[in-house]
């Protein structure tokens, strides 16, 4: 058992474990991703670099300040490593890892990180990456499995413990508090302890406290345990997303959008279990069986991650800890698992950075340095570069506004959807004698399951539309259109949703569009910003999203009236405001290389 745990948490990789994957550097171009795909290499690109740079210099505008100048190409998906054979030399690699910012003194860590990126790009997508896609998808799955799971228990908690419909919404506040804490702590912990530990433990913590909540004797204990469960599930998206991105070749970057398809699947599974258990058991048993079941499902996902899959530690993390030999071994391991070849060695890494313009800062980054660096992401000195020019400042402000608005607007409706469905969704139904004032529990949970099914294709469509060449689509267009339609159907739900059938139609369309919205938003945001400011920009966006999400249940619990319509109107207004912000964003990242 001790040896097994050591292999999962503390195993040190070695290139000697992966014999047969290394090829000489001079043969690397035969094994590149572009060569295997039959794409033409750039011929004589080295001689054209000067002209390309001159063209860029002559057409420089504010977008150049953002770091988003790109070479024109008929094929928008061409990768950064489509080099000719001459560029697979030490000198060629030196030029390639230093391009983009002339005159800059690169650190040893930065150059080696870029070289590892190139090696992973040459290996391309393979068995290991697709397995990781599924296992990281478990994180997205668990996130919505539990967010919707808590929402689905609210009517039962209210009835069993004698809590009013408004008061029981504080249960969601407990969950969001845990999500906020977990998101911050696990994101930071992954930089200090490594991705592998955080990747495995988040689902374990979620399953333990989630299952314990099924045995809670009273409502305060339920809230407390849901909050602890949230500290685990809150780490899934930041940890799993970062891990997947660090193993993802640039040419397959659209898979980051496709990863979001697991999110509505989590909602679907949660709604199906709730429909079965809550409608077929007494009120004090149904929700408990439901919570225990999704707790077991989460534990099974942990077992698959921890027991059946050997996860490589992130090579970027290993490099930051001064463990260069292990970082190289991980790249060899990826090539071995994908049945591909690689040219990366420690000697190549050292030779590429061995120039006078390299800043010889220590490669190893201490835990204290990581902590200081993460905390500095929220300092004014680190945020100030995000407003260094008008276009970048406007982009930053708008994307943060969108994240904050959606962070509050989404839970105001979705976190309490089972409640809205259970009593007609609007005051109109209660006033009109011809319309039913409420739906049966069976109708409520059946409709919720149908709504969940309707949302799944949204993420699949998002992955296609983000790269569509239409001027009205792409990242920005798809995001704005889906957000606008979501807001419209929220308004229609509260004004015309006087019957369960009407509610079902409006909410199904709304769920479909919101899954497109979230799928694009998670991929679009990190693409907007250049690498030097990407961490600060996305970190603040995530923080604002969680904080406003924490406020949403407090508003819903204390808003005047019966709480059936005002929260939905407010949700629609916030989503509509986010749409306005998206339209004003001055950047489209479709077909552009990540900087």
What are these model-predicted stretches?
Residues 1-150, 159:
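Cytosolic juxtamembrane N-terminal segment immediately preceding the first transmembrane helix
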Residues 151-181:
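Extracellular/periplasmic helix-loop-helix junction of adjacent transmembrane segments
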Residues 181-220:
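Conserved MFS/SLC helix-loop-helix module at the cytosolic interface between two early adjacent transmembrane helices
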Residues 100-130, 336-415, 428-442:
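Flexible cytoplasmic loops linking transmembrane helices in multi-pass membrane transporters
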Residues 252-301, 542-552, 560-561:
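Glycine-rich segments within core transmembrane alpha-helices of 12-TM secondary carriers
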Residues 146, 162, 194, 215-221, ...:
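Helix-breaking motifs and short loop linkers at transmembrane-helix boundaries and internal kinks
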Residues 173-176, 188, 211, 226, ...:
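C-terminal transmembrane bundle
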Residues 259, 280-366, 571-595:
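Central mid-sequence intracellular linker of multi-pass
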């Amino acid at each position: 058992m001790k040896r097994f745990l050591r292999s999962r948490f503390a195993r040190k990789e070695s290139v000697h474990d992966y014999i047969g994957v290394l090829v000489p550097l001079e043969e690397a171009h035969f094994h590149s991703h572009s060569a295997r795909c039959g794409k033409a290499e750039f011929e004589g690109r080295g001689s054209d670099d000067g002209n390309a740079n001159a063209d860029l210099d002559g057409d420089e505008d504010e977008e150049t300040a953002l770091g988003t100048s790109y070479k024109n190409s008929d094929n928008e998906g061409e990768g950064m490593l489509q080099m000719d054979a001459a560029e697979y030399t030490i000198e060629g690699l030196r030029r390639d890892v230093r391009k983009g910012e002339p005159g800059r003194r690169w650190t040893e860590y930065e150059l080696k990180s870029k070289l590892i990126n190139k090696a992973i790009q040459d290996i391309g997508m393979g068995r290991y990456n697709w397995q990781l896609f599924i296992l990281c998808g478990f994180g997205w799955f668990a996130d919505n499995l539990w967010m919707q799971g808590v929402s689905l228990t609210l009517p039962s908690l209210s009835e069993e413990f004698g809590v009013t419909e408004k008061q029981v919404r504080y249960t969601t506040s407990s969950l969001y508090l845990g999500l906020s804490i977990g998101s911050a702590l696990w994101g930071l912990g992954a930089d200090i302890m490594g991705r592998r530990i955080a990747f495995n433990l988040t689902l374990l913590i979620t399953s333990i406290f989630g299952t314990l909540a099924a045995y809670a004797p009273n409502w305060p204990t339920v809230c407390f345990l849901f909050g602890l469960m949230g500290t685990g599930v809150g780490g899934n998206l930041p940890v799993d997303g970062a891990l997947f991105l660090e193993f993802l070749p640039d040419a397959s970057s659209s898979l980051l959008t496709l990863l979001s398809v697991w999110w509505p699947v989590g909602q679907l599974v949660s709604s199906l279990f709730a429909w079965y258990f809550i409608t077929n058991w007494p009120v004090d048993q149904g929700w408990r069986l439901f919570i225990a079941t999704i707790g077991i499902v989460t534990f099974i996902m942990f077992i698959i991650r921890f027991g059946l899959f050997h996860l490589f530690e992130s090579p970027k993390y290993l490099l930051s800890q001064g463990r260069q030999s292990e970082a190289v071994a991980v790249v060899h391991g990826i090539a071995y698992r994908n049945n591909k070849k690689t040219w990366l060695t420690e000697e190549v890494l050292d030779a590429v950075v061995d120039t006078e313009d390299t800043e010889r800062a220590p490669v190893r980054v201490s835990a204290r340095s990581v902590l200081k660096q993460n905390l500095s992401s929220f300092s004014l000195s680190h945020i100030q570069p995000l407003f260094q020019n008008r276009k970048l400042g406007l982009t930053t402000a708008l994307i943060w506004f969108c994240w904050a608005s959606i962070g509050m607007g989404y839970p105001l409706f979705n976190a309490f959807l089972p409640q809205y469905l259970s009593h007609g969704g609007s005051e109109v139904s209660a006033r009109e004698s011809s319309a039913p004032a409420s739906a049966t529990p069976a109708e409520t949970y059946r409709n919720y399951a149908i709504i969940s099914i309707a949302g799944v294709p949204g993420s699949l469509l998002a992955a296609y539309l983000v790269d569509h060449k239409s001027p009205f689509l792409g990242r920005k267009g798809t995001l704005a259109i889906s957000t606008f339609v979501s807001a419209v159907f929220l308004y229609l739900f509260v004004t015309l949703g006087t019957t369960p059938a009407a509610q079902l139609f409006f909410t199904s369309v709304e769920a479909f569009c919101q899954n497109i919205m979230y799928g694009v938003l998670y991929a679009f945001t990190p693409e907007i910003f250049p690498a030097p400011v990407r961490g600060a920009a996305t970190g603040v966006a995530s923080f604002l999203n969680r904080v406003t999400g924490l406020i949403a249940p407090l508003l819903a619990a204390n808003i005047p009236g019966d709480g059936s319509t005002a929260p939905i109107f407010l949700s629609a207004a916030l989503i509509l405001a986010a749409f306005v912000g998206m339209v004003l964003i001055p950047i489209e990242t479709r077909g552009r290389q990540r900087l």
